[in-house]
C-alpha cells in the first residue's frame, strides 16, 4: 500500500484558526451592544433574549436584508468599515416603521477565503449599527466556502427581531385625507440602486476615488453609511400620534409610499420642498437617467416619509430636528380613487 498525504480542512480551503481569531477580535465590540434582556454570551448554539417587561401585549416583528451591490463597490474600493452599518440600517429601519423597538440582531458573513481584517472591519460596523439603533448583536455565522466565492469576495445578510405593543402597531390603516407628510433626509443613496450606480460609473468612465463632488471624492458620497432613524422615530412615536411611516428603499417613492396607504388615498409630494443632494444630481446627469427612473430607483434625499394629522406636524418637526434629523413637510394625503397612489408635482 502506498503512503497517502493526510489532508486537513485547511488543505481544502477552510481555516478554522482564522475563524477563531476573528471571534477573538470581535468579542469586545459585540459585548458593547448587549441589552439587559440578553441571556448568555457568544458561543452558544442559540442566543437567548427575554422580552422587555414594559410590554403588556408584546408582538414580535422580524426582518432580514442585505446591502445589495453596494457591497461590490466597497470591495472594489477596499473600504469595508461602513458596510456593517448599512446592513443593520436596512433591517432596523424596516422594523421601526411599524412602531417596533429593535431587540437583537444576527449576521451572516460568507466568503471564499476568510480575511480576518476585512471580516472584523465589517463586524465592527455591524456593532456600531447596533449601538446606533439600541439593539444587541447576539450572534452570527461566518462561512468560509472555497469554490463558492471568488477569492476574498464576501456577502453579508442581516436578521433582526424587534417588539411592539399590539395596540401601538403602525400599519397605515389610520392614514386619512388631510394628513401631512413629513420627510426625513437621507445620508445618500443608502443601500439601494447600486447596480445602476455602478453602471453609471462604468459608462461615464469616472474614477470614484479621484472624481470630486462638493470637495470630496465621489466614493465618499457613494459609501456614506445608511442613516439609522430608530432612536429619533421611537422618540417621535412616544410623543406624537403617527399614522404611517414608509422606509424609502428599493422601488423609491413610487413603490414604498403606497405600501402604507389605505384604499382611496393618494400621497401628493411637493417636489419644490427640498433640493436633491449633489450625489443624486450627479447620478442623473452622468447617467442621463429620467426623473421617473430616479424616483423609482433612488431615495433622492428622502430616507423616510411619515404621515400624521396636520395639527401635530409642527410639533413633530421640532422634535425630529431637535433629535438631529433633517425633517420637513414634503406633502399631503388627498382622497383619490386613482390607480396612481403617489403624485410628485
UniProtKB/Swiss-Prot annotation:
Keywords: ATP-binding, Cytoplasm, Ligase, Nucleotide-binding, Purine biosynthesis
Family as reported in the entry's similarity comment: Belongs to the AIR synthase family.
A family per Pfam: AIRS
Pathway: Purine metabolism; IMP biosynthesis via de novo pathway; 5-amino-1-(5-phospho-D-ribosyl)imidazole from N(2)-formyl-N(1)-(5-phospho-D-ribosyl)glycinamide: step 2/2
Gene3D superfamilies: PurM-like C-terminal domain, PurM-like, N-terminal domain
GO terms (BP aspect): 'de novo' IMP biosynthetic process; adenine biosynthetic process
UniProt entry tagged with the keyword Nucleotide-binding: yes
Provenance organism: Salmonella choleraesuis (strain SC-B67)
InterPro entries per UniProt: PurM-like_C_dom, PurM-like_C_sf, PurM-like_N, PurM-like_N_sf, PurM_cligase
Top-level taxon of origin: Bacteria
Gene Ontology molecular function, alphabetical: ATP binding; phosphoribosylamine-glycine ligase activity; phosphoribosylformylglycinamidine cyclo-ligase activity
Catalytic activity: 2-formamido-N(1)-(5-O-phospho-beta-D-ribosyl)acetamidine + ATP = 5-amino-1-(5-phospho-beta-D-ribosyl)imidazole + ADP + phosphate + H(+)
E.C. numbers: 6.3.3.1
Protein name: Phosphoribosylformylglycinamidine cyclo-ligase
Main location: cytoplasm
SUPFAM superfamilies for the chain: PurM C-terminal domain-like (SSF56042), PurM N-terminal domain-like (SSF55326)
Enzyme class of the recorded protein, top EC level: ligase
Subcellular location: Cytoplasm
Assigned GO CC terms: cytosol
Amino acid at each position: 500500500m502506498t503512503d497517502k498525504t493526510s489532508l486537513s480542512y485547511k488543505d481544502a480551503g477552510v481555516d478554522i484558526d482564522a475563524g477563531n481569531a476573528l471571534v477573538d477580535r470581535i468579542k469586545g465590540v459585540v459585548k458593547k451592544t448587549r441589552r439587559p434582556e440578553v441571556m448568555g454570551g457568544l458561543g452558544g448554539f442559540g442566543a437567548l433574549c427575554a422580552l422587555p417587561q414594559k410590554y403588556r401585549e408584546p408582538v414580535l416583528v422580524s426582518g432580514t436584508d442585505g446591502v445589495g451591490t453596494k457591497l461590490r463597490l466597497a470591495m472594489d474600493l477596499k473600504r469595508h468599515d461602513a458596510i456593517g452599518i448599512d446592513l443593520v440600517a436596512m433591517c432596523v429601519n424596516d422594523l421601526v416603521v411599524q412602531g417596533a423597538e429593535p431587540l437583537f440582531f444576527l449576521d451572516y458573513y460568507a466568503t471564499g477565503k476568510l480575511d480576518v481584517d476585512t471580516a472584523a472591519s465589517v463586524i465592527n460596523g455591524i456593532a456600531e449599527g447596533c449601538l446606533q439603533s439600541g439593539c444587541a448583536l447576539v450572534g452570527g455565522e461566518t462561512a468560509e466556502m472555497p469554490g463558492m466565492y471568488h477569492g476574498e469576495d464576501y456577502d453579508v445578510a442581516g436578521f433582526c427581531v424587534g417588539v411592539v405593543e399590539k395596540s401601538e402597531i403602525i400599519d397605515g390603516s389610520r392614514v386619512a385625507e388631510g394628513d401631512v407628510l413629513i420627510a426625513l433626509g437621507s445620508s445618500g443613496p443608502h443601500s439601494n440602486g447600486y447596480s445602476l450606480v455602478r453602471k453609471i460609473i462604468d459608462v461615464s468612465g469616472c474614477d470614484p476615488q479621484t472624481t470630486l463632488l462638493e470637495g470630496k471624492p465621489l466614493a465618499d458620497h457613494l459609501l456614506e453609511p445608511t442613516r439609522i432613524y430608530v432612536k429619533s422615530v421611537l422618540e417621535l412615536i412616544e410623543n406624537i400620534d403617527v399614522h404611517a411611516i414608509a422606509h424609502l428603499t428599493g422601488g423609491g417613492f413610487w413603490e414604498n409610499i403606497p405600501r402604507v396607504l389605505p384604499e382611496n388615498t393618494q400621497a401628493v409630494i411637493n417636489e419644490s420642498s427640498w433640493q436633491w443632494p449633489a450625489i443624486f444630481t450627479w447620478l442623473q446627469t452622468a447617467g442621463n437617467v429620467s426623473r421617473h427612473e430616479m424616483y423609482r430607483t433612488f431615495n433622492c434625499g428622502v430616507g423616510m416619509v411619515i404621515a400624521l394629522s396636520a395639527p401635530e406636524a409642527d410639533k413633530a418637526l421640532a422634535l425630529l430636528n431637535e433629535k438631529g434629523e433633517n425633517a420637513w413637510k414634503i406633502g399631503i394625503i388627498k382622497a383619490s380613487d386613482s390607480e396612481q397612489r403617489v403624485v410628485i408635482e
